Amino acid sequence: MSVFRSVLGACVLLGSCASSLALAGGAEGLQRVKVDLVAPPLVHPHEQVVSGPPKVVQFRMSIEEKKMVIDDQGTTLQAMTFNGSMPGPTLVVHEGDYIELTLVNPATNSMPHNVDFHAATGALGGAGLTQVVPGQEVVLRFKADRSGTFVYHCAPQGMVPWHVVSGMNGALMVLPRDGLRDPQGKLLHYDRVYTIGESDLYIPKDKDGHYKDYPDLASSYQDTRAVMRTLTPSHVVFNGRVGALTGANALTSKVGESVLFIHSQANRDSRPHLIGGHGDWVWTTGKFANPPQRNMETWFIPGGSAVAALYTFKQPGTYVYLSHNLIEAMELGALAQIKVEGQWDDDLMTQVKAPGPIVEPKQ
């Protein structure tokens, strides 16, 4: 930990020098575009294929520390979030664009924060140039020089794991300028895109085995850290709470639509699986320069990664998207539903005989 603090401290000092140079580089003279972020599972409107020169794409994110209810039993988490959601918003740009982020830490917060973009080069992914205390904001610009889906997360000195598992993570998608392609170079199109942010949570219990509730972040730290060190999460959830993407909040689609799922896990490995469907095309490392894998039943997310999977729905019904660590999915909460409308195709599946009395075969 002391090594990380020393490196981050040096980067902060270097950051003061770098910022004085304005980090102009190749961004001077490019068109500047402001984008309003939206809360997951939705993703802000964007083009899949672009022409013309790169742009400077401007985003603004505000850090919010708040208490969140994470299950139907009323269990609470003293959360730290980007823009108030867990995960934070998904940012989308194209390869060659410049991302210009204004990161705001309101005076109502109690902690220092920053952001490490796994897509960025230098200064600990930007963490060394973005540390802000309550009442400050900072502007970071970096070039999106490689395509793919990437994690971003908070990484303050000495507190990285706590901030990450308390909600401060999200995804950035850098699309190829000519769009997503299959291994033969054919354009792949999506009709909808959803972000699924998987979080492992570590809620302390009291001596009677009940989850504890804390009045503020500071009072939760030591107990939470003790649970974190067991490496045993109390909850594993999609988008901030058990059931966040089920029932009335289920994702939606229609037969014939292609849906891109961006699934991020900033801390632990995961194994996504779509019950009743597949991954038609899966970028298992989340990097679009690598050819996607075809017809996947279950794919893998290394901790600290975001993965993209594309599927065209062929049958109506309610699908379940989950981590195929079934204990974590069914017992701890890591599952979502997708409700799909359309006409049933008997050629793909049919019930030949309805349930009824057992008929013994004739001899």
Curated annotation (Swiss-Prot):
Its main location: periplasm. It comes from the Bacteria. GO terms for cellular component: periplasmic space. Coiled coil: none annotated. Its cofactor is Cu(2+); Cu(+); FAD. Residues 25-193, 194-363 form the Plastocyanin-like domain. Belongs to the multicopper oxidase family. Homotrimer. This is Copper-containing nitrite reductase. It comes from Pseudomonas chlororaphis (Pseudomonas aureofaciens). The lineage of its organism: Bacteria, Pseudomonadati, Pseudomonadota, Gammaproteobacteria, Pseudomonadales.
